[in-house]
Amino acid sequence: VGSEMCIRDRYKGTAIGPVNVLKKSESLIKRVHVENVDEELKRLDKAKEKTLQQLARLYDKALKEVGKVNAEIFEVHQIMLEDEDYQDAIHNMICNENVNAEYAVSITGDNFADMFANMDDDYMRARSADVKDISNRLVSNLSGEEQPDWENTEPSIIVADDLTPSETVQMDKNKILAFVLVHGSANSHTACLLYTSPSPR
């Protein structure tokens, strides 16, 4: 938590308080040659099932906090995770290039995110962040790394480059005075969660 900031929002009013800057560590996913493709596909399937379970728990949490309509964000994530084109692209990369699942998921996620980002429709462009969120969670489960815990311990203004829906729903909204997102989109699922979260004031 850093210095104090004053935020004025034309929709919600003014927030004054300490600043909590959230920084994400960008880990490089290495390309590793694998001999046993079948084992790699099994790893992928196991990580996918774990990811689906996590998304189901996030849905339940969001359902209690922001209602069914906004909780459906995490049902959409489950559908996107199981999307045939997305899964086929990952499988094909593992099988055809003998690469590790983490690398295949990372590259496929980037490709699909770029595809959405270049679409003309604002809503579809905002889905780019959803693909990245899903892919990052899948990679974390493959590598055995825990997703970062963005627990805020005191009331503060949250400043971040961007937030994923899963990061947003895990925060204690009663300790958030305001959000400042550098690359946030008004059409993103994160924005939907922020706008419908209970006000701390």
Language-model region placement:
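Non-catalytic, soluble scaffold/interaction modules
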Residues: 3, 8-193, 197, 201
